[in-house]
């Protein structure tokens, strides 16, 4: 088992390998972008601390904004895309825009990964600089020979990411962003997930947390509104039922476990079998013979690294047998080696005919806060997801 996890982790951690296109290769420094702006003076001390961050306490200090730093503007998963007139004319802006607005996986209706606004470089006013996620296109044949992604934190506001993508010309820019489209979108997705984890750190549902401790000897932070907690055999369910603009919305997080057998545990067939059996026993539908089940043919399964360990992440759709009801779910399965079991944290929503991206992402962040029994004893434990690093390759 340990050899399997180690092998997968080594493969997946390679996502941080640097990539680029163009003439030559250079190593990037994520904090260099503010070097020619007045923001450098305001953020230099924070940047220095960030480079020394090696544990949870220092990471928290890195994210703490100065009393003089304004709060960032905009909602989660909103991005401001900035380009020059030539960047609009050559299609460089459109290329990146199309990547950022690609469909979010695991949702029945078409919803973009991000809500993106596009402006000309000259329109980047003091007000717009407060946006939480900013990407600036810099194409200059006289200044750049290599395509590169760089970013700085909390330049004009907090929390904030100000990223730049530089290139020699439009062709090199397009080639770079298309080759690294998944890494670029994942970079900003993880930034937003980590921001939500920071919110959960300060405010989470105590009853769900206590139920997970008693049932599994584990820990989890879920949104405080999930205040209806139901427990069963190796099963805990936190839920929230409410109306948003007169439309019914249900938010749910469940934690359940089953014995770990071998690496074949993490096949799609076995996942669906175990999930359906757990849901049938614990989440009945309205009437006899009705229960939650996994919608076949829509599962997107990926092998990930969560807290330095292997995790199976599944995004898909659920429905109720013989009943017109369904929605989206995301599950994160991890191995509790101490107790030789698989512990699954899953979020699912019911919000018919309305956008689900933001609520599903909010619940997804909570899934990554799950601490297994072995992790509770760690003196230092980081809840944050590892960042995606995009810099030139050899």
PLM regions and their residue ranges:
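Short, well-ordered beta-strand elements
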Residues: 160-169, 253-257, 341-350
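Surface-exposed amphipathic alpha-helical segments
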Residues: 174-198, 341-394
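Bacterial N-terminal signal peptides that target proteins for export
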Residues: 1-9
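Start-of-domain marker
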Residues: 32-159
């Amino acid at each position: 088992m340990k050899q399997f996890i180690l092998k997968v982790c080594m493969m997946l951690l390679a996502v941080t390998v640097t990539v680029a296109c163009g003439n030559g290769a250079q190593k990037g420094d994520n904090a260099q972008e503010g070097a020619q702006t007045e923001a450098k003076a305001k953020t230099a001390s924070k940047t220095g601390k960030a480079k020394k961050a090696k544990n949870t306490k220092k990471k928290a200090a890195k994210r703490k904004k100065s009393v003089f730093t304004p709060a960032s503007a905009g909602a989660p998963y909103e991005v401001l895309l900035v380009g020059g007139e030539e960047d609009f004319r050559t299609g460089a802006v459109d290329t990146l825009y199309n990547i950022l607005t690609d469909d979010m996986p695991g949702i029945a209706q078409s919803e973009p990964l991000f809500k993106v606004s596009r402006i000309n470089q000259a329109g980047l006013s003091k007000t717009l600089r407060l946006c939480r996620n900013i990407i600036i296109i810099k194409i200059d044949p006289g200044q750049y020979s290599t395509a590169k992604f760089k970013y700085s934190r909390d330049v004009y506001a907090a929390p904030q990411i100000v990223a730049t993508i530089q290139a020699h010309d439009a062709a090199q820019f397009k080639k770079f962003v298309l080759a690294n489209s998944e890494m670029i979108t994942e970079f900003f997705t993880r930034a937003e997930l980590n921001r939500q984890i920071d919110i959960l750190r300060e405010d989470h549902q105590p009853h769900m947390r206590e139920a997970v401790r008693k049932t599994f000897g584990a820990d989890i932070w879920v949104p405080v509104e999930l205040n209806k907690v139901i427990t069963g055999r190796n099963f805990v369910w936190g839920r929230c039922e409410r109306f948003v603009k007169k439309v019914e919305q249900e938010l749910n997080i469940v934690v359940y476990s089953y014995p770990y057998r071998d690496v074949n545990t993490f096949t799609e067939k076995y996942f669906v079998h175990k999930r359906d059996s757990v849901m049938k026993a614990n989440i009945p539908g309205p009437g006899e013979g009705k229960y939650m089940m996994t919608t076949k043919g829509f599962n997107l399964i990926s092998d990930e690294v969560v807290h330095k360990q292997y995790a199976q992440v599944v995004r898909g759709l659920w429905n109720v047998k013989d009943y017109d009801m369904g929605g989206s779910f995301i599950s994160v399965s991890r191995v509790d080696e101490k107790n030789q079991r698989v512990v699954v944290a899953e979020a699912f929503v019911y919000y018919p005919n309305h956008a689900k991206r933001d609520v599903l992402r909010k619940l997804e962040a909570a899934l990554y806060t799950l601490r297994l029994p072995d992790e509770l004893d760690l003196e230092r434990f980081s809840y944050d997801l590892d960042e995606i690093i995009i810099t030139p390759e050899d």
